[in-house]
Amino acid sequence: MLDSKQLRTELQVVADRLATRGFSLDVARIESLEERRKSVQTRTEQLQAERNARSKSIGQAKAKGEDIAPLMADVERMANELAEGKTELDGIQAELDAILLTIPNLPDASVPVGASEEENVEVRRWGTPATFDFEIKDHVALGEISRGLDFEAAAKLSGARFAVLRGPIARLHRALAQFMINLHTGEHGYEEHYTPYLVQAPALQGTGQLPKFEEDLFKISREGEADFYLIPTAEVSLTNLVAGEIIDAKQLPIKLVAHTPCFRSEAGASGRDTRGMIRQHQFDKVEMVQVVEPSKSMEALEGLTANAERVLQLLELPYRVLALCTGDMGFGAVKTYDLEVWVPSQDKYREISSCSNCGDFQARRMQARWRNPETGKPELVHTLNGSGLAVGRTLVAVLENYQQADGSIRVPEVLKPYMGGVEVIR
């Protein structure tokens, strides 16, 4: 969440910056709550001073043998008024906190201003899309030829937006995940983690999915116990490992990676990408998370993005990098790069990774801090996350970019060690 002090002292500046994201901040409501808060706080402080003075008078009156009953009654009355004032203050603060939980992060000054994905800025491209001298098939048709992708069987089990993978295609999917994990742990310095796929509400609030995006989540209600949610990304479980911690400066940067299934309701995706594996309720992803000193987070974002790019480069898949505009960034991001891989059947680039610097937005929600050696005081860390990569979409890209005229698939060179000698999937 945003810094409440910044919201109070720079309210209009914050509102103007949020407006570039298409978010309308209710300035009047916040000003009204802040005025009430100040008024009640001033009143309670004055009352506390009066109560302290009256309490002192009781001792003096008692020493003189005077009747202290009226003074005692006054002190008791003031104590009751103070309790009421505290309750009122707590209520006002709860309202302000509830508002804060719905406000997105402030975009960095380097983020291009724009209203939608149409105004994202291309930063660079890598590789050249292949030309085919035969009619291109999409990954669904290629999966049917090898009997490796079965959407009908998945629908029988679970309904729409699921897939069953078989044989060499299932092995290729596993190979991709293993390759990604090995690359990030072996060359990029991440520590592999295995985390729960079910989390409770505080974890999702910590990374920003709750309360605003509950409809995008799969919830498991339990009578008499805290609800569970299926993770929409390992960002939730990995980032929350530092919740409530004060981290020694020598431990930073912390670089974590995990391969997990991800679960999303796709509540706002009705009618989009209904064919194939591009948009599913359950998909695998290799997620990278970094926890860093605030002064180093923008540099870390460039490194995180490069780590994701390296996967595509080694797979020899053409891609481009976009700097997302203010109106297209995720809720918790200060700055985001999207990686889009070339999908031949669609004749366009499709998102395969999103790499974001969240600044201290998540850290403030989680109270994740580091001890600054210069001040000796705990300060909020900065957190970053990025897909390295979405495994299902990478599988789609490999199937389509490595297809041959007869519908067979060449196995990328870098994946052959994971495929037990299989070089072509038929």
From Swiss-Prot:
It comes from the Bacteria. ATP binds at R264, S265, E266, E351, I352, S353, S354. GO terms for molecular function: ATP binding; serine-tRNA ligase activity. Pathway: Aminoacyl-tRNA biosynthesis; selenocysteinyl-tRNA(Sec) biosynthesis; L-seryl-tRNA(Sec) from L-serine and tRNA(Sec): step 1/1. Transmembrane segments: none annotated. GO terms for biological process: selenocysteine biosynthetic process; seryl-tRNA aminoacylation. Its EC number is 6.1.1.11. InterPro entries: aa-tRNA-synt_IIb (IPR002314), aa-tRNA-synth_II (IPR006195), aa-tRNA-synth_II/BPL/LPL (IPR045864), Ser-tRNA-ligase_type_1 (IPR002317), Ser-tRNA-synth_1_N (IPR015866), SerRS_1_N_sf (IPR042103), SerRS_core (IPR033729), tRNA-bd_arm (IPR010978). The keyword Cytoplasm applies. It is found in: Cytoplasm. L-serine binds at T233, A234, E235, E287, S387. GO terms for cellular component: cytoplasm. Consists of two distinct domains, a catalytic core and a N-terminal extension that is involved in tRNA binding. This is Serine--tRNA ligase. The gene is serS.
